[in-house]
């Protein structure tokens, strides 16, 4: 069972293919969500905040455990782009998550690069997602967006796939986060790839990182570069 979390300007439907879905082909059920602040959530008065994402994990897992077809010992999380941050916070604060895999990272504490050096539409959208109209107040809020003090609690397998030249979240922040973790973890870096991992030889030719074994019984090739695991 995978809880799939989209990015900042994405939506839950994009995470589940109508045919040939990679999770479903492996016999893994998918719950694709719009979490706090994502897509239609602001229209319902549910905005991005650290506390809302901390609370999201128990709410989602409790709902899943109410379904008899779900194996409560094998609930994982996947996240892409800003979903990498949201999924990390959810995992850190929900011990029933068995494994987590994220890609195309947004893991810079405070999010300075994506909000101040990239397209201004990113900041404008996130202000709407978090219910801010005053930019100065939003800038103070953005400082609270951090994995620091959270990832240290993650004890289950964690996979992160990043582009070496990520222009929205410098790689150094992802590397620092991985060093701060104490559980089993793997960092895969694709040479020359930007934020959206792919369309470079390293990503197109592989090898490709394996899915966390706690979610999939099918082994895959070894990853290109990995961090030490504990």
Regions found by a protein language model. Give the residues of each.
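Alpha/beta-hydrolase fold nucleophile elbow
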Residues: 68-81
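The serine-hydrolase catalytic nucleophile loop
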Residues: 8-21, 35, 172
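Alpha/beta-hydrolase active-site loop
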Residues: 47-70, 89
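Short alpha-helix in the alpha/beta-hydrolase fold that links the catalytic acid
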Residues: 156, 170-179
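Catalytic histidine neighborhood in serine/cysteine hydrolases
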Residues: 178-196
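Hydrolase active-site cap/lid region
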Residues: 89-140, 156
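Short beta-strand/loop motif that positions the catalytic acidic residue
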Residues: 154-155, 160-162, 166
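Catalytic histidine-centered segment of alpha/beta-hydrolase-like enzymes
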Residues: 193-206
